[in-house]
Amino acid sequence: MAGLKYWVWLSEVKGLTNRSKLLLLDYFGTPENVYYADEDEYRLVEGIEPRQIALLAEKSLENADRILGACSRLGLRLLTMQDADYPMRLRNIFEPPCLLYVKGQLPVIDEEVAVAMVGTRKASPYGIEAAEKIAYGLCKQGAVVISGAAAGADSASHRGALRAGGKTIAVLGNGLDIVYPAENDWLYRDIAASGALISEYPPGTAAEAWHFPVRNRIISGLSLATIVVEAPEKSGALITANTALEQGRDVFAVPGPIDAPLSRGCNRLIADGAAGLITDSWDVLREYEAIYPHKILGERVELPRTLGYQAREEQARAKQAAAEEILSLPTLNLKTNDAGLTDDQIAILRTLKDGALQVDDLIEKTQIPTRRVLSALTMMELEGYVEQGSGKHFSLTVTLLEE
């Protein structure tokens, strides 16, 4: 436990990016060594900026001790990236989380046929039923289902997995002591009992809109494959799909009606060849049967007729959740820079304030080299500050504050 407080301290240094934390760990070896280093030693780390060195001068462990106390009371486990049971699949992604909080029993992910299921929070009855049925089939056939416990397709995926008596893992964008959405209290309990809830955010961290695109890299990173159940053209589920592709993982999508707005994202993934078309769980699992013959239990399974009966009720809840999300559009204060943005990122955000722009326009307006613009956009898309739309136009997903 003594060593864990340094992991918590490093993970909670305000304004320090995940990339910077990884650079420090790579240089110093352990967070304890990072803690006891001085400013001269920090300057030796390539990629660490003077502003970040000043942040590391704050050596109080009071917040870390408070978080560890909360974890003890809540029965949470802390998993660091240097622990032997930290999943290798996750360790190998771009910018893995340094620290994870875990409630429940996390299976040995590297030995499992873990499949992520994502989709819109405003899922239609069609999407809800598809999510439940596919998740049910996956778990009955020996897979582990990973999702985000959000309203809509996520919740339906977890329900299907639980109905099958299988293991399911929820990756949250908030602390494990906070239920979001509130009506998923029972779902949280059932997931923790049969699998695990995990988060890179400590107890007490509220659900913020920009947390969710960041946590998506964990959902796909833990998984062999990602299934997009239902997604419109600008769905966060498509960010997860793109992240999965960048991680070298397989992507599948459930096709929908050609005139259904909620299926346009899935249909586009399939049409572009970015995702394989599936209609049931076996369409996914047969890809891994030869590699995991001891895990995959058979071909198709018989589905209970009652699967999907909650679809319309879930749709109503999803609409309410979506409305609440719009009302709580996150803000980003550029003056205080609590998010730890680089100068390049701040310049790009300010340039996008007047409207969406393509990369070439951003390079011209900011006079920042191409490589740095692309790097900054990638990081900000992962953090949920910008999104890429049609025609490769980038736009803001936050409200900028300058006060």
PLM regions: where:
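Short, small/acidic-rich helices and loops at N termini and domain boundaries
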Residues: 1-84, 269, 385, 391-392, ...
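Glycine-biased, small-residue-rich flexible motifs in mid-sequence functional cores and linkers
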Residues: 1-4, 80-403
